[in-house]
Amino acid sequence: PQCTGFALFFDDISGEGTNPVKQTELLNRLTKDFVKSKGDVAYLTVCPTDYSKLWANPTPQGSLAIYGETLDPSIEVFWTGDVVCSDLTPETLDWVNSRIKRPAYFWWNYPVTDYVRNIILQGPVYGLNTSLDSNDLCGIASNPMEHGEASKLALYGVADYTWNIAAYNPIDNWERGLGELMPKAREAYRTFAIHSCDTETGYRRDESWETKTFRIGDWNETEAQALWAEFDKVEKAPAEIEKGCTNKGLMSELTPWLQEFGKLGTRGKRSLELARVYRDGKDDADFWNKYIRNLMSKKDREDYEAHKSGTMKLQPFYENAMDDMAYGFLTRLSGETPICYRGIGSFHNAKTTLSKLMFDHDTTTYYTSGIAQKAGDWIGV
């Protein structure tokens, strides 16, 4: 039986080690003199220097084409897709397989968060094409977070996908996974998980898809009541999870995020209560006192930035609501329109509250698009 396997990684290096000819010579020698001579060793796996289409040389002189021409057919080749963190698609596999002349071994950089360590990904596993088979890829490796227990929700999805690719359903799998990981506090865990999915930058994920938020100027009482109920669930979820979670390792990993999640629920509820006072417009002093009470202090923001959730809808609702009410209140008091700076641009996250970091008077914070600029991109104020 093949009980041992080895992999060589030529990713993220420079110098002579990037030479694909020397790489294949080494790999072929190891295959001949070690793997095949031993007999009980699994096929080698290699991560090429050109592991992503983002920078891979597409020509016949590129390393992938050299792999295809000279690398022992038994050796499996890692591939991350069109970019470092990307979906598994027939198109990206066609591109790489035609060069390496074998089905690629897909290295899926999810749920890894080494580029956003202040986020813990608990959303559904999607972005994996369900029409693929062994002619398209030889396997899939999921790169987990540094949080082993919290990674299990995503790994449950990847395992389910590999078990039956054609029948895989991301939402059905996610719903089952929540119950498997936290059966005694499933609903509270679901409340946290559905609002802890997106990365804000890089490999974007859908989040809070069951929650409708709005601007204060578009107030609708029915929607406001529904949003208050959701923030109430958010506020209560940490205590319910702590009470029902029997996995101490998972609880330990989630706790810093749950603490901030509960605070997010509290300030969301207060924002809606404050909005009613604001809309009533009868007691300016009461409004302003409650407004000041609901502002996040510097410490509050530091704590939230360190362990973020609700980044796509919940926290933006709070930020926008507080800004809209302050703007409207000052306009009402002074009779003049205040000057308000806002970030604009072609980047998707320029439209989010991340752009406020341009104007927070803190030299240690900044806005970043999170992606490389290309022709036609712009950012402005």
Predicted region positions:
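Short, conserved phosphate-binding/catalytic loop or strand-edge motifs used
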Residues: 6-13
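Catalytic-core regions of glycoside hydrolase
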Residues: 13-175
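Short, Φ-rich (hydrophobic/aromatic) sequence segments
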Residues: 153-164, 266-269, 377-381
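C-terminal functional modules
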Residues: 167-338
